[in-house]
UniProtKB/Swiss-Prot annotation:
The keyword GTP-binding does not apply. GO terms for cellular component: signal recognition particle, endoplasmic reticulum targeting. The keyword Heme does not apply. Signal-recognition-particle assembly has a crucial role in targeting secretory proteins to the rough endoplasmic reticulum membrane. It must be involved intimately in the translocation of a wide variety of protein substrates. It is found in: Cytoplasm. One of its GO terms (molecular function) is 7S RNA binding. Residues 237-270 are annotated as: Disordered. Residues 259-270 have a biased composition (Basic residues). This is Signal recognition particle SEC65 subunit.
Length: 270
């Protein structure tokens, strides 16, 4: 005979009015919308922490870095007003990969091949713009999607109120040609990367050449806050020494089996 069970706690009773879509994320009903699962990857959190550290150490922060037209040094700006930010929108951007002779046009190169150099840096591009009298803004932590290992970009003001800021430089093509000529006469060295305002965290970091990866367009001289030098979790395994191969085991040749001698006598039937 069945036994009737008494239930004292009302919370123990199944809620039959619950919408099924709240239990099954693949269902969608008029009552409850489809539940979209949230995926949080550990590398995303590492990337955010890394970007925040670089923004603080490289001197980019929330403002911009202006290049002093007299000294050529990169100086951090104060907080910009809305009017100043609107003026900056008229500036055009230049990335180092535009002048990289190791790259093809599909890999990000924009300047003519004969005016491109190896290991272009954003700081040298800013120096070239300064020498031409072009106002420039240096952004140390910004990177091109195809050149993430060489951080830095430069904003330049070519025209103001529709008129060229410098006579003879009417457009971006002409400016890139003049900058390419400057880069040709100012090749990148290990001392060049020390001119950036990295901050105290990079005082003991020495610039060094990095090995080039086969099939990858990249610099072998990069700024000190490059992911190639800071052991970023996404790139630190690129240059780890491969494990040594296991010792070769001497395999003895199999012994030859003795074959039975052939019977060379013919049997003649009578």
């Amino acid at each position: 005979m069945p036994v009737i069970e008494e239930i004292d706690d009302i919370d123990d009773i199944d809620n039959l009015e619950m919408d099924l879509a709240e239990l099954d994320s693949t269902m969608k009903t008029p009552v409850a919308p489809k539940i979209v699962p949230t995926v949080v990857r550990s590398q995303d959190q590492e990337e955010e922490a890394y970007s925040a550290a670089i923004s603080g150490n490289a001197g980019s922060g929330s403002g911009f870095n202006f290049v002093n037209s007299t000294t050529g040094q990169v100086e951090k700006s104060h907080s910009l007003t809305k009017e100043e930010l609107d003026e900056i929108k008229e500036f055009q951007m230049l990335y180092p990969c535009y002048f990289d002779t190791r790259r093809t046009h599909a890999q990000g190169r924009r300047a003519p091949k004969d005016l491109c150099v190896e290991n272009p840096l954003a700081k040298t591009i800013a120096d070239a713009a300064r020498s031409l009298g072009i106002p420039s803004i240096f952004e140390g932590s910004k990177t091109h999607p195809q050149d993430f290992g060489n951080p830095g970009r430069v904003r330049v003001l070519i025209k103001e109120n529709g008129k060229p800021f410098v006579s003879g430089i009417d457009n971006k093509r002409v400016l890139m040609k003049r900058i390419g000529e400057y880069l040709k006469s100012h090749p990148t060295t290990l001392e060049s990367v020390k001119q950036l305002p990295y901050g105290p965290d990079f005082d003991n970091v020495e610039p060094k050449k990095i090995p080039l990866l086969k099939g990858t367009a990249m610099n072998d001289i990069v700024p000190l806050h490059s992911p190639y030098l800071t052991q970023h979790p996404m790139t630190k395994s690129l240059y780890d020494a491969p494990p040594p191969p296991p010792p070769a085991q001497q395999v003895s040749a199999p012994e030859k089996q003795m074959k039975m001698p052939k019977n060379k006598f013919r049997v003649v039937r009578r």
